[in-house]
Amino acid sequence: MSHVKDFGARGDGRTDDTDAIEHAVQQGDGLLLFSRGEYRLTRTVVIDLERTGRFAVSGDGGLATVRMDGPGPAFFVRGTHGGTADPKGFSPVVWERERMPTFSQIEIVGSHEEACGIRFEGVMQATLEGVLIRKCRTGVHLTKRNRNFLMSHCHIYDGAGAGIGVHLEGVNLHQANIVGSHISYHRHAGIKVERSEIRNLQITGCDVEYNFDPEGADCADIWVDTRQGTVREGTISSCTVQAKRSPGGANIRIEGPDLPLSTAGGLWTISGNVIQSQDINLLLRSVRAVNVTGNSFCSGFQRSVVVERCRNIAMSGNTIDYNPDYSGDRVDGMVVDGSSGVVVSGWIFESVRAGEEEGCGALTVRASDAVTVSGCQFFDVAGAAVQLAGVRDSLVTGNIFGRRKGGELPEGWVRSVDGGKGVRVSGNLRMGGEGTMVVSRGGAAPED
């Protein structure tokens, strides 16, 4: 192993150790070891895998800190892999010299406004384990082309400026796993994907929290932006995704360009998460084939779930709950707008206030077709439980509507306005027989 202090690094937090660390990269044996201390960098250390061969960076069990005192990433790892993950497409040099560069048990702290953590480009099997990155503009940055990225047991925390924790930017990437990590306190996004071609992105067992900017617009804990590029085949599972209110902010935001068939983004599963405390908890826009199952939603200050211009969205077994122990001017509820082939099944809507707004219900469906609302329970919601406007060929069936806390009953538990054909409302239950089931204006009356 190559101890950077053997190459002249001081690790005293004052000396510029950049030259010594670069010397260790170029002349060492490939295992770059930082013992206890604080190592100051003033420029990026480039690890060119074609030249160095297989490489690993270790911080001696987390005892070492690298402080980036200049702009750009502290470490830039560059490989030559230009193919896919198909074993037949590899050049020999990738397996012989470049595969699986590893960072483990080390802290990187930014002390420059443009400092970043680690950047990977052209790399096969980049692996991060037990890495702490703080106060960086970008924590982990993947660009151009990478394959089989793995990040586990990491802390990407307290980003600088409009920071991003993990940024997949302009990258062609297949097989990426972000597992068991804390990614928190970045003002723009915890995890962001943009201008990329990505397949197989798994985000599981993570705490992705407090990535928000109360004074800025458009931020998210997890933001998959396919308005340029395509991102498909992804999972967000067993995570806590939580923030505070931001203008236009979302906990999870997956969006594509306004294409007729919503093809740019999709084939996603969002399951078993706690998702709460933002303007919108979950925003799906111009995507298709997304499954949303077994999640707990809370404190959607504008809405819990918004589905816009989407196709083939299946959402089942989720809760929107109002816990009296929680404070905040939440609205909660769901909007489905301009979409086709949407299933809302087995939800619980508790004390949702979205129906206080004109033309809205706890669940509002607008200008959509082939929507099924079934097996849901609506308790103590303000106004209508289900508002249908310009909806065609859809079902509202087998639901329970009621007041458990008393209070004024709505004009109708289900309201249908602005026309629409082939809408059927049937087999629903009013608790205690209270209230009117259906109010229909302007169009074919639904059946009750």
Protein language model regions, located:
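N-terminal extracellular ligand-recognition/capping segment immediately after the signal peptide
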Residues: 8, 18, 26-56, 60-72, ...
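Flexible, charged surface loops at secondary-structure boundaries
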Residues: 25-28, 50-51, 97, 390, ...
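Amphipathic alpha-helical repeat scaffolds
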Residues: 22-25, 383
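Right-handed parallel beta-helix
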Residues: 58-63, 99-110, 125-135, 146-161, ...
